[in-house]
Amino acid sequence: QPIAPSIIEATHKAVEEMGHAETFHGYAPDLGYEFLRSAIAKEYKDRGCHVDIDEVFVSDGAKCDCGNIQEIFAADSVIAVCDPVYPVYVDSNVMAGRTGVYDPKTETWSNVIYMPCTQENNFTPALPEKTPDLIYLCYPNNPTGSVITKDELQKWVDYANEKGSVIIYDAAYEAYISEENIPHSIYECEGARTCAIELRSFSKNAGFTGMRLGFTVIPKELMCDGVALNPLWARRHGTKYNGAPYIIQRAGEAVYTPQGQAELKAQIDYYMNNAKMILTGLKSAGYSVSGGVNAPYIWLKTPDGMTSWQFFDYLLENVNIVGTPGSGFGPSGEGYFRLTA
């Protein structure tokens, strides 16, 4: 779907401002304009979450933050990831030299804790026995479309606080949540401000794939080995980043207006109706499927023992449908396939 009308209107207005000396904007503040950070903080407050303006770091997308956040942690930090998983979590740590030795037979890294999420455990990871320094969680989940209840998420928060781990919580798909007992933010959990960083995207809730905007929340209470992570990320952000463009941040501000919220809800309803049709159709055809209720992804078991890539080829050659082979998300993704609504 195209960008919502009220967001386009805000973008046009900001573009016009750039053509006049009295309203021209140059380099943006490193951490984001106050008008957008205030709107973001208010949205958290409306959900009962305590997030201050100076805990919000605006960027040009959640993917960049997913890849860059590891830079403020030690080179020998041990990471834990769900398996299957969004590849950026692992690959960015590989590039940082943090993941050890790769085993081509198992397609795993020696210094990464993998938490299998398969049909057998209802795509729900178990708390790691070995203590990780960083725990990557994504809910609603990419690629499986699974979700986590507040009670279950609280267990992760309690675990992280007990073990001294930091949770990197990717909430890019929170706008697709339709069920009441599913948290939209990890900060809905007691104690999360001392153990969790949250990542958000404007691409998933507002279609900013071609505009690029996202943000990261780091509470001031969050410490790692006695070092506060909020000012550390602020220093890193200011060193390597010049701020998201004024025009795009004004567009992002429009997302939080009543009109913007109404337009975006209609778009999300459109996608989720697609997901419902795909989910219903696949179930009636006898496929084993999950997701598609609180996320725009449908995760299905490949039929007849096909590998993920064999099923990809079959769909492309026989019915002209393109999806994503599950094996691309990690070893536990083999034998699965992701469709997008």
Protein language model features and the residues they cover:
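PLP-dependent class I/II
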Residues: 1-18, 31, 35-341
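A short, highly charged nucleic-acid-interacting micro-segment common to nuclease
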Residues: 25-31
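Pre-Walker A segment
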Residues: 20-24
